[in-house]
Structure formats: structure tokens, C-alpha cells
């Protein structure tokens, strides 16, 4: 019997159609990637290839205008340690920066809708990104699944530009201003998503952090008014173009209160089910017949501070919960940081390879 390619196996698993092998998937911070090359893979080695990971991101889309100097007027000072991204958001780094930077918001002082509407938000076109289709085909020919990455889809992109406190105040007391910000971001994100969909990606990876460690970031009423309908419109347009595309949605933190909204919006897979915030068995029993999952192995607890045996037990236990049909791409819930020992990373990969379906 012909075995499935890594791509076929992953897509079957995420669609809860059974699977042959458990995929290995994780991301390393730069220092861990360096130690991988020094201690395990060799100079220049690709850890995704080394561990046989079944998917690759096709790459970030290129905006029509790549000249970031158009954002300079939104800042009082452009510092040497500051970078401005393609959305115009400033990032100040420091010698101790590992994963995050100090973020500067170009529209934090805006008071009028006209200031939002005149903001030079990036424009993305199919013509500028015709290369995506070739990249998708290249990955598929290698038997790998293709991923269009759009984490920071609506909420995070909007507050990156406006500032979180400002945007939340707008949502409560200046709805016209909030509408202008969200409309601007929704249009840009929809354009990006459609480029990926038309290029034929297997998976569209969306996301906005809408949870905190032990609670949701906003009320259900605010979420259903501001974010849910925009996400649903975006996904609906994508699935009109590519009905079989798999949509994964990322949000750190506790978000159980929002899961039904996400399912109704058209999400197929939820990431990461942060182990320190939510119990996977409970979440699976409530929602596992309608949605699949990616993650579940804690990066605040078992990955950095557990034993290799505990890592394996977590992996096998969660796979047992999901059962033979799949529905769980078991993986660490976040980027692996320097405190995670290689013994635990290798134990995770071994657990995936050693797992026997019950």
C-alpha cells in the first residue's frame, strides 16, 4: 500500500480523516537554532528538514510600496535601535531582547477619522506576489504542505498601529474612530488572504492574541461586535475562492469563551490550546467534533522544566485523547526559548515518532 506524503498525512490529520504518522512541528528561537547547528545538525543545517516537518511557510507577501520612509512623519525621532515594519509600526530592540521589542504605534495620537483614512497602509496585489504560486507548487512537488502565514490578522494589526489602550478606548467611547481603524486593517488583511488562497496554499494561518493567562482580553459583547464579524467575512471570502483550504487560528492565553465564535467564523484548526490555561481533554470533549487542534504541549511548564519522560507522557496522552481519526497536530504551544533543554526537544520528536495509535 502506497504511503501518504507528509503533506497528505498532515491534511488528513487536520481534517480528522485518520493519519499514518504523527507529524513533528516546533519553532526555535535564534539561540536554539544556533545550538542546533553547532551540536546536532551541523553548520547551516535546517532544523525543519532535519526533523522531517511536513509544512513550510511560503513566505511573507511583498507590498506595492516598500519605502518605509513614508512612515517617518508619524514619529518624533527615528532612533538607531529602531526598525519600522511594513505596516509602519516601530520596534525598539535592546541587548536583552529575545522574542519581543518595545513597540511604537504610528497612529497613537490620531484624533480624527481623516487621520486614519489618510494613513499609508500597505497595499498588496497578486501581480506583485505572483511568485507565491510558484513557491506553493515547489513545496507540493516535494510532498510538503504550503502555509500562508497571517498571524496578526485584525485585532493585533489594528492595535499595533493604533496602540492597545487607545484602540480599546475607541471601541468603548469613539466607535467612529475604531471603525475606521478596523475597516482599514480588514481590507488589507482580506487582500493578503485572497492572494494566498488564489495561489493555492493548503493552509491559511491566521491569528490574533485575544486571551490572557487566565481570562479573555475583552468581553464577549465587544468581541462579537468588533472582531467576530470581520474575521467571518474574511474567511468567507477566502473559502469562496478555495473551499478546501484549511484555516488555522492562533491565540495565546485562555480563549474558551471565544471558541464557538471562532468555529462559526469558519476556523478549522485552533492553536495552541495553551496547556497552562486550558485543559485539552475538556476542550476536546466540548469542541473536538467540530474543530481540530495544533499545540497542547506547554512551553511555560513541561518543555522548559519537565523531564524527557514527562514530555513524552504529555505527547502520548494528548494523542490518545484525539484518537485514531486525528484532529491534533501535537506540538509545543509557542516558539521554544533558550531555557528549553535539547533533551526535551528530542524527547518530543521521539514521542511523535514512537506513538502507536490505540
Predicted regions and their residues:
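Active-site loop segments of alpha/beta catalytic cores
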Residues: 1-40, 84, 93, 116-358
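Short, solvent-exposed loop/edge-beta patches enriched in aromatic
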Residues: 18, 51-56, 76-79, 140-142
